[in-house]
Amino acid sequence: MRKLIFLLFCVYLVSCSPSNNAILYESVAIPEAGWTIDNPVRFTVEIVDTTQPYDIYITVRHNTDYEWMNLFLFMKTYYPDLEFSRDTLECFLADETGRWFGRGSSSVRDHVMLLQRNVRFPQKGRYQFEFVHGMRTENLRNIMDLGMKIVPSR
């Protein structure tokens, strides 16, 4: 009986998780050979409610052999009417002493960073987000995954 109660409690916790109401929660694996500038990472989401505000997060997973304390990303947002906007993001992964931010153990670190809060998408339809790294190397090594999460604002 205790096992059943524990199992039901776990199911309840998972169902209350903020990830369950995400309209986008996706991660793309970066090849072990590295992330080249000509290989953008793309995420697509369908927006049906333009009155709902959303919070947008970027997730980064890297190993501790990553050479820099930050990660620059160039982001293009394609709107349903095929217009687009550009933005440059700087993700801080470590402090100036080299101590990694984020969570993880051993040689892998996970970062969840708020990109924008209370965003209202101006048009209904399909949006595409495209990311290219903006680091000073053609082939960026030791970034393992790049992800995006869009959830209704609370």
Please place each PLM-identified region on the residue numbering.
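Exposed low-complexity, polar/acidic, P/S/T/G-rich flexible segments that act as propeptides
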Residues: 73-78, 136-154
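Post-signal peptide N-terminal segment of mature Sec-exported envelope proteins
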Residues: 23-46
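A beta-strand/beta-hairpin structural motif
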Residues: 42, 91-93, 101-115, 131
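Bacterial signal peptide processing site
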Residues: 17-20
